[in-house]
């Protein structure tokens, strides 16, 4: 099947309509199509994350967003069948993760498919060592690759996705190669026929999908073809526009700049005219002998100069490409994008060791001043690779500065390369994501966030999401999600659910001088593993939800005004953040702690509860034995103590059984400290956050001793977390929006990000820091989304398989 690129634009919210409900799918689409991208509570323009937004999309019909009421009842009917399926999933997942690990460990210089365009240019090089007049190509394997890889319609290029720029450029250069070496004329003639029949399609080709430098290199090849008397309609009207574009682009390229400063023009030297000063240009070679890792540009340079370094590079490329040619090396971009895809698909936790090696490689070639390019040791950098490196390195604990982004600031705008005219949605999307991993005082990231937010909003508003660097399944959907749920409010399992539907797998394709594929980044193995893992985790979550409901009934929490909906939300927030099957204990500890806290605060807030009553409960809690009934009745105080004690005892026993660590005393101290705050009517709501974190970390075995509580970094984390969550809780409960207080939350979040991800000499386990951040994100998320959207996410994350 061949995919034709057209101007039709997919509706960017299609991934929201998959929910099964009484509302028909078509009705759901019609409903969503009324509304553009929106934030439910806050607009994220600039540094003010909390500007109020007028909603134009409220709905009274919760069913199409996800009616969670149907999930509030227990259902054990499929437990046995689900267990067998779960075993099968685990076995399959093991095989897929091993396959992915092999891919990551064997990435080396980055895998790309062989490119007809570069292969043909390398095949142009004559073997000057031949005696006599019988000239032959220096790289006969490249010529043979061209002969062996013509498509059935007579063209060369990407087979599945039909892009007219790609097909015409590849076909023309291969026709020239066959003509130059006077071989396989029937294939050449078939290629010429394809060009004649399809040249007019340039009139309707999407400019956004024009291959890089097409307006430079295509006219050059036409001139070369004309010199070889290849029968092509050189006076076709559509070619006049291409030549005009070439002249415009050449006027924007100062010749002196080309010869003195490394620029992206080095990538397309074969498209320039003959008045080049090679003595000066050779000084701009990369250490590997290439001109910006382009075999075509380097082949052209070699034919003009006979430079030995150019030849060495080309020989290496052909050897690495099994007789053809491709851009080489591509080691940095493949590593970064593979990590990014696996993270967003929600399966990165399987590959922690592999990620460490991949990022060590990237960091080895990180240039603090200039940033990086697709391949190592480049003398040119771009914003896309640079911002992706900053974000991923920073999130994994590497000490990197964002100052290199100043190279891509042009006035009040940001560009991918110096001198770029038109911005790209995907590059600004990646820069926007990078800008949110912001430390206090980093002005360049603040400016990048402001610019990219507005840029991406305009892309969606004007249906201008076609990208000049990649053809992907759902770029509008990716942008919509990033704007709708900024990083602070994006829960891992929610993001994974969306991205599994947005990721095109092996169907996604990249745009350079021609179309190309990066199997290390885009493949169906990643997608298959992500879907399998998602359903595997979800099955565990549904089982735990049954446990939560039974526990809820047994403990009689409804006496304290706690609803099953609150129970479901509590479990969802935990499961959407700590989702791994193996982390059931931490997940349940999180969810149950919220319910226990709610029970105690509800009891304390009762008008009949006095300071004396609070103190009595605290004193009873300090006693090791269970409370006794008074006059044979189980009072509320007794029920509170019983539920609390049983929860802590069970958690302690499970942790000891699984990890061999006795956390009972530490748990007792943590909850006792919180009860003291509650007794004194202090702001225990803030302290509740730190209690959640301590309980989760203790259950995970991350806190081995109490001394860490007095560590300065831990105290800073704890205080800042309590402060931020207190403000977010106030926003959620009191519907406070706007004002300086809200700006301060943004500043506090930046400080928290630095404490969690900054490369400090802290004694605190990174898992402990990550728990702080995960809990804070759930508070941010809860303040950020509407009840309808949360219902929808609950349905998608916990109950609907992918």
Swiss-Prot record:
Cofactor: Mg(2+)
InterPro entries, per database record: Isoprenoid_synthase_dom_sf, Terpene_synth_N, Terpene_synth_N_sf, Terpene_synthase-like, Terpenoid_cyclase/PrenylTrfase
Residues annotated as binding Mg(2+): 382, 384
A GO molecular function held by the record: magnesium ion binding
Record-listed E.C. numbers: 4.2.1.133
Residue stretches spanning the membrane: none
Any GO BP: copal-8-ol diphosphate(3-) biosynthetic process
Highest taxon, organism lineage: Eukaryota
Domain comment, as recorded: The Asp-Xaa-Asp-Asp (DXDD) motif is important for the catalytic activity, presumably through binding to Mg(2+).
Family, as annotated: Belongs to the terpene synthase family.
Name assigned to this protein: Copal-8-ol diphosphate hydratase, chloroplastic
Provenance organism: Nicotiana tabacum
Gene expressing this chain: CPS2
């Amino acid at each position: 099947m061949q995919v034709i690129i057209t101007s039709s634009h997919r509706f960017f919210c299609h991934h929201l309509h998959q929910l099964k409900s009484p509302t028909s799918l078509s009705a759901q689409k019609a409903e969503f199509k009324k509304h553009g991208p929106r934030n439910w509570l806050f607009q994220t323009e600039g540094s003010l994350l909390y500007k109020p937004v007028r909603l134009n999309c409220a709905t009274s019909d919760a069913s199409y967003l996800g009616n969670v009421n149907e999930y509030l009842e227990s259902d054990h009917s499929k437990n046995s069948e689900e267990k067998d399926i779960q075993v099968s999933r685990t076995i399959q997942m093991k095989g897929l993760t091993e396959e992915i690990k092999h891919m990551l460990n064997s990435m080396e210089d980055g895998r790309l498919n062989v490119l007809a365009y570069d292969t043909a240019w390398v095949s142009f090089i004559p073997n000057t060592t031949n005696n006599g007049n019988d000239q032959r190509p220096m790289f006969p394997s490249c010529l043979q690759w061209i002969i062996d890889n013509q498509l059935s319609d007579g063209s060369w290029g990407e087979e599945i996705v039909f892009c007219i720029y790609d097909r015409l450029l590849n076909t023309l250069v291969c026709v020239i190669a066959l003509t130059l070496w006077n071989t396989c004329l029937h294939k050449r003639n078939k290629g010429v026929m394809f060009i004649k029949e399809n040249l007019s399609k340039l009139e309707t080709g999407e400019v956004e999908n024009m291959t890089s430098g097409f307006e430079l290199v295509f006219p050059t090849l036409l001139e070369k073809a004309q010199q070889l008397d290849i029968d092509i309609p050189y006076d076709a009207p559509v070619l006049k526009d291409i030549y005009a574009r070439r002249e415009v682009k050449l006027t924007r390229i100062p010749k002196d700049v080309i010869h003195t400063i490394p620029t992206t023009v080095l990538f397309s030297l074969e498209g320039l005219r003959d008045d080049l000063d090679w003595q000066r240009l050779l000084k701009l070679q990369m250490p590997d002998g290439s001109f910006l890792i382009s075999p075509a540009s380097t082949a052209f340079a070699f034919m003009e100069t006979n430079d030995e370094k150019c030849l060495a590079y080309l020989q290496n490329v052909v050897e690495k490409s099994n007789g053809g040619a491709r851009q080489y090396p591509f080691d940095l971009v493949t590593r970064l994008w593979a990590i990014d895809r696996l993270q967003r698909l929600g399966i990165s936790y399987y590959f922690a060791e592999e990620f460490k090696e991949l990022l060590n490689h990237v960091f080895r070639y990180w240039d603090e001043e200039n940033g990086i390019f697709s391949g190592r040791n480049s003398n040119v950098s771009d914003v896309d690779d640079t911002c992706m490196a900053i974000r991923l390195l920073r999130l994994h604990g590497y000490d990197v500065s964002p100052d290199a982004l100043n190279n891509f600031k042009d006035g009040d705008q940001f560009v991918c390369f110096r001198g770029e005219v038109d911005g790209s949605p995907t590059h600004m999307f990646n820069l926007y994501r990078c800008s949110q991993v912001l430390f206090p005082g980093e002005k360049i990231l603040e400016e990048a966030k402001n610019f990219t937010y507005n840029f991406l909003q305009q892309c969606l508003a004007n249906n201008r999401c076609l990208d000049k660097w990649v053809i992907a399944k759902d770029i509008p959907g990716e942008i919509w999600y990033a704007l709708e749920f900024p990083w602070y409010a994006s829960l891992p399992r929610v993001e994974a659910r969306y991205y599994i539907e947005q990721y095109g797998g092996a169907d996604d394709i990249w745009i350079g001088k021609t179309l190309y594929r990066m199997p290390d980044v885009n493949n169906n193995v990643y997608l298959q593993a992500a879907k399998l893992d998602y359903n595997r985790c979800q099955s565990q979550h549904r089982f735990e939800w049954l446990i939560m409901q039974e526990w809820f009934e047994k403990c009689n929490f409804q006496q304290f005004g706690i609803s099953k909906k609150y129970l479901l939300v509590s479990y969802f927030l935990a499961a959407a953040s700590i989702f791994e099957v193996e982390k059931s204990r931490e997940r349940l500890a999180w969810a149950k702690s919220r319910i226990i806290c709610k029970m105690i605060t509800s009891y304390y807030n009762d008008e009949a509860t006095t300071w004396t009553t609070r103190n009595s409960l605290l004193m009873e809690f300090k006693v090791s034995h269970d409370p006794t009934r008074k006059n044979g009745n189980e009072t509320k105080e007794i029920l509170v103590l019983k539920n609390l004690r049983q929860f802590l005892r069970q958690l302690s026993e499970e942790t000891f059984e699984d990890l061999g660590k006795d956390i009972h005393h530490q748990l007792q101290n943590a909850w006792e400290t919180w009860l003291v705050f509650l007794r004194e009517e202090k702001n225990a709501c803030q302290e509740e956050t730190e209690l959640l974190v301590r309980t989760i970390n203790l259950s995970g075995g991350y806190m081995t001793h109490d001394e860490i509580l007095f560590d300065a970094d831990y105290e800073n984390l704890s205080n800042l977390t309590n402060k931020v969550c207190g403000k977010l809780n106030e926003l959620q409960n009191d519907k406070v929006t706007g004002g300086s207080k809200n700006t301060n939350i943004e500043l506090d979040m930046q400080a928290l990000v630095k404490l969690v991800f900054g490369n400090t000499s802290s004694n605190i386990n990174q898992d402990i820091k990550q728990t702080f951040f995960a809990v804070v994100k759930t508070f941010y998320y809860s303040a950020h989304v509407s009840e309808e959207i949360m219902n929808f996410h609950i349905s998608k994350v916990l109950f609907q398989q992918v």
